Amino acid sequence: MHGLLLAGLLALPLNVLAHPTESHSSGVSRRAIDITSYRLPQISKYTKSDAVPKQDGESFTTSSTGDDNVSSGDYVTTATNWLKKTLPKATYRLVNDHYIGDSGIGHVHFRQTAHGIDIDNTDFNVNIGRDGKVFSFGNSFYDGEIPKANPMVKRDFSDPVNALHGAIQTLNLPVTAKPENVKAKPVEGKENFKFEGTSGALSDPKAQLVYLQKDGGLVLSWKVETDVGDNWLLTYVDANKNDQVHSVVDYVSAAEYQVYPWGINDPTEGNRTSIHLPWLKTLSTDWHIDGKGWYPTTRGNNAIAQENPTGHPEYENNYRPKSPLFIFKYPYSLAMTPPSSYRDASITQLFYTTNVYHDVLYILGFNEKAGNFQINNWNKGGVGGDFAILNSQDGSGVNNANFATPPDGQPGRMRMYTWNASTPERDGCFEAGIVIHEYTHGVSNRLTGGPENSRCLAALESGGMGEGWSDFFATAIRLKPGDTRATDYTMGEWASNRPNGIRKYRYSTSLTTNPHMYVDADGLTSVHAIGTIWASMLYELLWNLIDKHGKGDVTKIRPVLKNGVPTDGRHLAMKIVLDGMALQPCLPNFVQARDAILDADKNLTQGSNKCEIWKAFAKRGLGVGAAFNQTKRTGSNELPAGC
């Protein structure tokens, strides 16, 4: 998963949202290549709501549904004019993934261009408030000199096939591309190609000519896309020196059902029960239809779940349980072995947990417009065709899990493994926290920077927060009625057979039990280690809001909202964290993400929880005076005036 990390083992890089794995599948050789050394630079800026310059002139009104007598172009025009005013000399294009979220904020994203070519790691996101004015914005546009020579005139760049070979050779990719067999077929867009005649990748590799912002300048590069299973890579190969790789992004982050019900994290917390019609009314009707068919198996609009013992990429024809009566009840006990003997129960549990989480997130705002995972978007916005592919007992590894998040319109892919630290071995599908952790990688990658941009958590601190968000949601969902702020939680305890879980510290509001502070991130190179710090801050936030607003009935699945605002502190924390993801810039750092959460609360509740939020972050060193620096962060316990 972009997620769970076993102590003492190396974490997987970037977006392989994964725990370290004993993998025998295709992928980048970790011993030969450390792709984390090719991370994108962290250059984004975020202007929070109270720092946005005063605006004059006409505005429009958004609504929580975007259905007012207002055309979608109004807020896009406002955002475009803001960009023109802020950076009058910039050239850019509008990314076609703008939407008005359920919180009433319009989200608009732009990509900088030079000579009509994308500068691929430059983004400008504008958030338009309910009053029709700019609420906040993020910016990573290049402000240096644009190359005067247009490379398209003299065709001053290599053939894309050579760039593909450069990526394969430099990163030691398990892809075969013999020159006599490979053809670069043009597809829609300028200098955009799909390669035919290769083998080893899960889909045809692609290449697009782009600029990359690096070391204070622009380098012309081929962006080569290769999905090799454990890694789904964007490799930026120099357009002239094809043996030089400038950067790498990895999209992968390491009826009736008899299941462990929602809120039961693993078999130690409760028993399996039969649940009838568990889906929430979220416009998806039920989990087994997609507008084209009704499937009496673990397939539907949101997900398709199956076993995958070979670890191969094919999934359509893999085994999945079938029930003409839609009764998915199968035997399972902790003593059963081998795992294949309870594959039906495993697949059913994975399908159930993922679909419930999809529905909860939908109510909290991660819907079609925001880039969620659905085959059919029911004419509600976004791009369909992208349910989540869920592989139970995936044979490509053990002691791990991962989730790959391509842009909106392409299916996400979750691989759940078995864990062999106990006898008999354990199946990660039965630990809900692992499933939720992995799926949350898809959520944070789709929300940050817009649904069409899946590289916005590719920097070190951004990727760390991706791990932290995943741990946070997995923990918030498993709260029990008797829990208090004195309750501590682990991650991955059951599957790994480790009483203290797989993080350095338990999640706790006690600085004795968990002493993590912001400055602890200095010198860390693991996204999992950095993520534990971020999740520790969010755990403080969770309990500050619960102490103020209550937990609600944690035995109920459906969040209760009043005027779009969750009535309990648990779901309120989840909501403003989700909204903050959509507000923050591409490649955010801790300080920017904190400010985006404060802005999310300001928009949602008029800032009524400002002090609770500040106290959570300041307790762990992310107070008013905190400042980001890659190697030397500044910690602060200072609170703003009035708190």
Curated annotation (Swiss-Prot):
Cofactors needed by this protein, per the record, are: Zn(2+)
Amino acids binding Zn(2+): H437, H441
Q: What's the superkingdom here?
A: Eukaryota
* Spans annotated as Disordered: 47-69
Q: What is its EC number?
A: 3.4.24.-
Give me the residues of the propeptide, which is removed upon maturation: 19-254
What top-level class of enzyme does the UniProt entry assign? hydrolase
> Which residues lie in Polar residues bias regions?
58-69
Which InterPro entries does the record match to this protein?
A: FTP_domain (IPR011096), Fungal_virulence_M36 (IPR050371), Peptidase_M36 (IPR001842), Peptidase_M4/M1_CTD_sf (IPR027268)
Subcellular location(s): the record lists: Secreted
**Signal sequence coordinates:** 1-18
Q: Which CDD domains match?
A: M36
Cofactor note from UniProt? Binds 1 zinc ion per subunit.
User: What molecular function does GO assign, one term?
Assistant: zinc ion binding
Q: Where is the composition biased (Basic and acidic residues)?
A: 47-57
A cellular component term from Gene Ontology for this protein is:
extracellular region
> Which Gene Ontology biological process is one annotated for this entry?
proteolysis
Q: Write the record's keywords in alphabetical order, separated by commas.
A: Glycoprotein, Hydrolase, Metal-binding, Metalloprotease, Protease, Secreted, Signal, Virulence, Zinc, Zymogen
Q: Where is the active site?
A: E438
Q: Which residues are glycosylated?
A: N271, N420, N603, N629
Q: Provide the function of this protein.
A: Secreted metalloproteinase probably acting as a virulence factor.
Similarity section: Belongs to the peptidase M36 family.
- What is the official name of this protein in its record? Probable extracellular metalloproteinase 4
Which species does the entry assign this protein to? Arthroderma benhamiae (strain ATCC MYA-4681 / CBS 112371) (Trichophyton mentagrophytes)
Gene that this sequence comes from: MEP4
